[in-house]
Each structure stands twice: as structure tokens, then as C-alpha cells.
A protein has these predicted regions:
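Ankyrin repeat (ANK) tandem alpha-helical domains that serve as protein-protein interaction scaffolds
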Residues: 1-189
Length: 189
């Protein structure tokens, strides 16, 4: 990729962040600027479904399609996630649920369950706990049976999310090495 291509690619990404579809069309169709997967990723972050559709229809390179789904999930853009996965056939991976949980988007997690998503990683629960999203944490653990680890306890404690911490402790989440939970009291080392 030459410097000019790299500059054009960055320009397309920046235009996608403006949410101005007509400008993106102009730089692609009239100015023939190059683009890459980060353009559709930016459109997903912004929740711009029409721009995503334009990117798909015009074969925006999507070697990292799963990131577009993850960004839509992280930002709570259900319509975009639905279109990317169901119509454009973009894959999703463990980041899709993990980033939705991190941002507290229970509706995204519910959609994933409806669609038989099964790529939950331990940090889905850790991300929910770290950011105080008790509803997501409970849903992941009780409905999805997502795995968890000691990081969830550490993050809930470090970020002062007592409701998440208590839920983790009450439900026997593993503790960080050297930590103890005895008689209703957490002891950290």
C-alpha cells in the first residue's frame, strides 16, 4: 500500500465517523478513494445502518468482519448488528458478547441468545463486573451459563461495584489468588 492509498483509507475512515453517507459516496465514487474494513467498522460504531449497507453493497473489504459486529454490539446498535450478521453474513466472535457486556447492552445479549450465539468467553462476565452491569452479569451467568473467573471479582472490587461483587461472591465465583471470603467478609492480599 503506498502512502497515497494509506491517506485515502484514513480519509474514508474519518468520513465514516462523520456519519455523512453522501460524502462517503462522493469520495468513493467520484474521487475513487481506497478504503478498508475500518470504514465499515466506523459506520458500525456510529450506528449508521445506511452507511453499513452502502459499504456492503459496494464490497468494502471486510477481512475483519467480526469487528464490525463487535463494534455494533459494544455501542448498542442492534439494527446494525442484525443487518451485519443476518443479511451481510458477517461473522461474530467472542468479542461480540464481551463488548456488549462491557457497555451494559442487555438487549444485545438477549439478541445473541435468540440467535444461538455460543462464543462466550470468561471476560464477558469480567467486563460486565468491571463496569458495574449487574443485569448483564446475571444474564450471562444465569441464562447463558457463561464462564467466569477471578478477574470478575478483582474488577468489581477495584472499580467499586458492590452489587456485582456481592453477586459474584454469593454465587461462588473463583477468587483471585490469595483472596478469601469468610463470614461475609472479603479479604484481599
Amino acid at each position: 500500500m503506498c502512502i497515497r492509498d494509506r491517506d485515502e483509507t484514513w480519509f474514508c475512515i474519518r468520513v465514516a465517523y462523520t456519519n455523512k453517507l453522501e460524502l462517503l459516496k462522493w469520495i468513493r465514487e467520484e474521487k475513487k478513494c481506497e478504503w478498508d474494513y475500518r470504514t465499515i467498522k466506523a459506520a458500525a460504531i456510529q450506528g449508521n445502518l445506511e452507511m453499513i449497507k452502502y459499504c456492503v453493497a459496494n464490497e468494502c473489504p471486510m477481512n475483519e468482519w467480526a469487528w464490525a459486529c463487535a463494534e455494533a454490539a459494544e455501542n448498542g446498535h442492534l439494527e446494525c448488528l442484525e443487518y451485519l450478521h443476518e443479511d451481510a453474513k458477517a461473522p461474530w466472535d467472542f468479542w461480540t458478547a464481551s463488548l456488549a457486556a462491557q457497555s451494559g447492552h442487555l438487549h444485545i445479549l438477549e439478541y445473541l441468545v435468540e440467535r444461538k450465539y455460543d462464543e462466550y468467553a470468561e471476560f464477558s462476565c469480567s467486563n460486565a463486573a468491571e463496569n458495574g452491569h449487574l443485569d448483564c452479569l446475571k444474564y450471562l451467568r444465569e441464562t447463558v451459563k457463561a464462564p467466569w473467573n477471578a478477574q470478575a471479582v478483582r474488577y468489581a472490587h477495584q472499580n467499586n461495584h458492590p452489587k456485582c461483587l456481592q453477586y459474584l461472591l454469593d454465587n461462588d465465583c473463583p477468587l483471585p489468588q490469595g483472596w478469601r471470603y469468610e463470614h461475609g467478609e472479603l479479604h484481599t492480599s
